[in-house]
Amino acid sequence: MKAFVWGVLVVLTGVLAPVAEAASSAVVLMYHRFGEPEYPSTNTTAEQLDAHIAELTSGAYNVMALDDIVAELNAGEALPDRTVGLSIDDGYLSIYSLAWPRLKAAGLPFTVFIATGHIDRRSSRHLSWDQIREMRDAGVDFGHHTVSH
C-alpha cells in the first residue's frame, strides 16, 4: 500500500508541476469519495488524500477556491504560478467524515458539487442537508451537480 501511495504522489507531482506553471491557468483536482474501497474507480483512500494534502501544502502550489479562480480569470487577472483548485463531486458522506476534517485542518479550500436527489431521499451514503449547512457555514463552497446525477 505504501508503494502505491508513493506512486500516486509521484504521478500527482509529475502531472501538476508542469501544467500548474502555465500562465493564467489552474489545475483542478476532482474527487468523488474517500475511504470507500468497495468503489475503486471513484475512491480515494485516506492515505492517498493525506499524501495529496502533504504535496499541496508543501509550498510548491497555490491552492485557491474555485470561485476565486473563476473570478480572477473573468477579471483578466493572472493567476499565481502553480494554481490548483479542489473539486468533490456528488455529495458522498465520506466528504464530511473523512475529507473535510483533513482539508479543513490543512486550510485547503474546496468546492462540493451536490447531486441533490440523493440528499432529498436521505441516502445513508450521502450528506444530509444539515451536514451541508454545517460545512457551508464553516466556509466550504457548494455548487450544483444535478438532481439525479
Language-model features and meaning:
Residues P18-A22:
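Sec/Tat signal peptide C-region and signal peptidase I cleavage site
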